[in-house]
Amino acid sequence: MARVKTGPMSRKRHKKILKLARGYRNAHSKLFRTAHQSVMKALSYAYAHRKKKKGDFRKIWITRINAAARMNGISYSVMMNGLKKAGVAVNRKMLADLAVNDLPAFAKLVDVAKAKGNA
C-alpha cells in the first residue's frame, strides 16, 4: 500500500479556516493558528447566542405586554393569570404584536383577563 501524504488536504483545511476568518483583524485573518482559534471561538459564540436569542425575544415581548397592560390598568402577571384562567390560548409573541399594532383588540383581552382575574 502506498504512503499517502497529507499536504494537499492540510492546505485545503487551512484555506477553509482562513476563508472563514476573512474580515478578522491582523494575524487573526492571516496566520492559521490564531485564525483557527478565532474561528472556533466565533462559532461557539454563534451557537450559544442563537440559543440566547430566544430568551432575548421573550424578554422584549414581556416588556411590551407589561407596558400595554399597565396602560390598561393591570399588571403583566395578573393579566397572564387571568388569560390562563379564561382559557385564552394566545402566546406572548402574539400578545406583544397586538400590544404594538392593535391596541383595541389588546384592550379586549385585558378586559377578559380582568373579569377572570377577579373571579
Curated annotation (Swiss-Prot):
Record PROSITE patterns: RIBOSOMAL_L20
GO cellular component terms attached to this protein's record: ribonucleoprotein complex; ribosome
Record bears the keyword Ribonucleoprotein: yes
UniProt-listed InterPro entries: Ribosomal_bL20, RIBOSOMAL_L20_CS, Ribosomal_protein_bL20_C
Keyword Ribosomal protein part of the UniProt annotation: yes
Pfam families assigned: Ribosomal_L20
CDD domains: Ribosomal_L20 (cd07026)
SUPFAM superfamilies named among the record's database cross-references: Ribosomal protein L20
Keywords: Ribonucleoprotein, Ribosomal protein, RNA-binding, rRNA-binding
Gene Ontology molecular function: any one: structural constituent of ribosome
Alphabetical GO biological process terms: ribosomal large subunit assembly; translation
PANTHER family assigned: 39S RIBOSOMAL PROTEIN L20
Family the entry assigns: Belongs to the bacterial ribosomal protein bL20 family.
Its biological purpose: Binds directly to 23S ribosomal RNA and is necessary for the in vitro assembly process of the 50S ribosomal subunit. It is not involved in the protein synthesizing functions of that subunit.
Protein's UniProt name: Large ribosomal subunit protein bL20
